[in-house]
């Protein structure tokens, strides 16, 4: 008997079909609890049922397709990703992982695979936070890390809360606690995802073996000088807030390059007030997004930034404050899962390398309740969160084969 393998053509067809469920505009915009979400939900549920999975939704709308095992006492082995998107994003981010999970389920069905553990194939909601500004909400719910009060405090731009939107969508957000999983009922979770960076493609590597997910620190720096007339205020009498702010940005860049361990820093937002072409800048606010797979690197970097900002401001005769408004620690994935992914890629003779994820994923929260492994596949030119996002479908097929092999290894 010839065993069936994952098919790139089926993966492509399903990803393209799901990409149609998008709000108007470039790329894919599929926000949570919208008509576009509803259409994708219907398609995914139908695909799960066609793969002989029993289907249920939890309180927030995570869709769980389940293939029962021969030993009902064993905890489930799960695979999945998210199916929401950023605004005007691409058709692969998250969705590729969901589709490849379903392709794995189809291959198991076609080959008559008999699994001991229950297998679950999960499509997760609201990872991006594009509607409610709270990333990885669905993954946090699976990990039992969403507080009931968040269902009311998290609102969209129209003031609609998660609780209101989920209820209108036909869900029961009041049953939030029942969505939480534990090691007792979840043996492991595997997530296939596009890399969203350039490393695999540049090095011509087929599979990324994710070892860690970066921690994130977000800082807001406020520099306050004095606004004056641009033509009548001598240079030596100015309290221009922009000049020291620019030096601060340059120094942060220097600090990070000195660390040279995968840590990165980005100034993604900067405002200058009053903002007139003939006015000396009186106030400058900018954000710093700091990411690293190493907690110690983040701690040292923040300490250096805080000292530097104070020194630069003092020398320039301006005031400055640093406020940390987001803190997420790095996650080291379970060594047993990292080894399983690495061994699967080797057995399939796919080129592979260890890699740290520079983006956050649901997996980093699910890792708090069970062992987690991640499989990366290449992103063309490293582009993601844009309409031009692209991953070759044959690379997704290879990733699916790795996932299948890992699931079977865990099932032994």
Swiss-Prot record:
SUPFAM superfamilies: Bacterial exopeptidase dimerisation domain, Zn-dependent exopeptidases
Tagged with keyword Metal-binding: yes
Binding site for a divalent metal cation 2: 93, 128, 385
The record's free-text note on cofactor binding: Requires divalent metal cations for activity. Binds 2 divalent metal cations per subunit.
Region (Involved in dimerization): 212-330
CDD domains assigned: M20_bAS
Binding site for an N-carbamoyl-L-alpha-amino acid: 196, 229, 278, 291, 360
Annotated positions for site Necessary for dimerization: 238
Pfam families: Peptidase_M20
Signal peptide, first to last residue: none
Reaction(s) the record says it catalyses: an N-carbamoyl-L-alpha-amino acid + H2O + 2 H(+) = an L-alpha-amino acid + NH4(+) + CO2; N-carbamoyl-L-tryptophan + H2O + 2 H(+) = L-tryptophan + NH4(+) + CO2; N-carbamoyl-L-tyrosine + H2O + 2 H(+) = L-tyrosine + NH4(+) + CO2; N-carbamoyl-L-phenylalanine + H2O + 2 H(+) = L-phenylalanine + NH4(+) + CO2
One Gene Ontology molecular-function label: metal ion binding
EC number(s) recorded for this UniProt protein: 3.5.1.87
Binding site for a divalent metal cation 1: 82, 93, 193
Keywords carried by this UniProt record: Amino-acid biosynthesis, Cobalt, Hydrolase, Iron, Manganese, Metal-binding, Nickel
Use of this protein: Could be used as a biocatalyst for the industrial production of optically pure L-amino acids from racemic 5-substituted hydantoins.
Activity's dependence on pH: Optimum pH is 8.5.
Biological processes per GO annotation: amino acid biosynthetic process
Keyword Thylakoid assigned: no
Top-level taxon of origin: Bacteria
Family: Belongs to the peptidase M20 family.
Biological function: Catalyzes the hydrolysis of aliphatic N-carbamoyl-L-alpha-amino acids to free L-alpha-amino acids. Is strictly L-specific since it is inactive toward N-carbamoyl-D-alpha-amino acids. Shows a preference for aromatic N-carbamoyl-L-alpha-amino acids, such as N-carbamoyl-L-tryptophan and N-carbamoyl-L-tyrosine and, to a lesser extent, N-carbamoyl-L-phenylalanine and the non-natural amino acid N-carbamoyl-L-thienylalanine. Carbamoyl derivatives of beta-alanine and charged aliphatic amino acids are not accepted as substrates.
Subunit composition and interactions: Homodimer.
Protein's name according to its UniProt entry: N-carbamoyl-L-amino-acid amidohydrolase
Source organism (scientific name): Paenarthrobacter aurescens
Gene: hyuC
């Amino acid at each position: 008997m010839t065993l069936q393998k994952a098919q790139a053509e089926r993966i492509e067809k399903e990803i393209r079909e799901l990409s149609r469920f998008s709000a108007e505009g470039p790329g894919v915009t599929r926000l949570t609890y919208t008509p576009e979400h509803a259409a994708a939900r219907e398609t995914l549920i139908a695909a799960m049922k066609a793969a002989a999975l029993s289907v249920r939704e939890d309180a927030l709308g995570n869709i769980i397709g389940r293939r029962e095992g021969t030993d009902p006492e064993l905890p489930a082995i799960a695979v999945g990703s998210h199916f929401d998107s950023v605004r005007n994003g691409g058709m692969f981010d998250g969705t590729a992982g969901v589709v490849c999970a379903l392709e794995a389920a189809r291959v198991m069905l076609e080959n008559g695979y008999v699994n001991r553990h229950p297998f679950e194939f999960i499509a997760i909601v609201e990872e991006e936070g594009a509607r409610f500004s709270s990333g990885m909400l669905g993954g946090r719910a699976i990990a039992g890390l969403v507080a009931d009060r968040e269902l009311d405090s998290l609102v969209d731009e129209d003031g609609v809360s998660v609780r209101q939107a989920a209820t209108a969508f036909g869900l029961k957000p009041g049953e939030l606690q029942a969505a939480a999983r534990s090691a007792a009922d979840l043996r492991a979770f595997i997530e296939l995802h596009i890399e969203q960076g350039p490393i695999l493609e540049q090095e011509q590597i087929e599979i990324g073996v994710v070892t860690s997910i970066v921690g994130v620190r977000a800082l807001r720096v406020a520099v306050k000088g004095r606004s004056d007339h641009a033509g009548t205020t001598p240079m030596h009498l100015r309290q221009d807030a922009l000049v020291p702010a620019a030096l601060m940005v340059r120094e942060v860049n220097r600090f990070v390059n000195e660390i040279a361990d995968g840590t990165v820093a980005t100034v993604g937002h900067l405002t200058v007030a009053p903002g007139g072409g003939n006015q000396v800048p009186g106030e400058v606010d900018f954000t710093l997004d700091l990411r690293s797979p190493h907690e110690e690197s983040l701690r040292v970097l923040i300490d250096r930034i805080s000292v530097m900002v104070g020194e630069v401001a003092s020398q320039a005769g301006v005031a400055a404050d640093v406020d940390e408004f987001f803190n997420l620690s790095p996650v080291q994935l379970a060594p047993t899962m990292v080894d399983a992914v690495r061994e699967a890629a080797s057995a399939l003779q796919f080129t592979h390398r260890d890699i740290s994820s520079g983006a956050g994923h649901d997996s980093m929260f699910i890792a708090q309740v069970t062992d987690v492994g991640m499989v990366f596949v290449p992103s063309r030119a490293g582009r993601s969160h844009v309409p031009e996002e692209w991953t070759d479908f044959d690379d997704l097929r290879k990733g699916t084969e790795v996932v299948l092999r890992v699931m079977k290894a865990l099932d032994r």
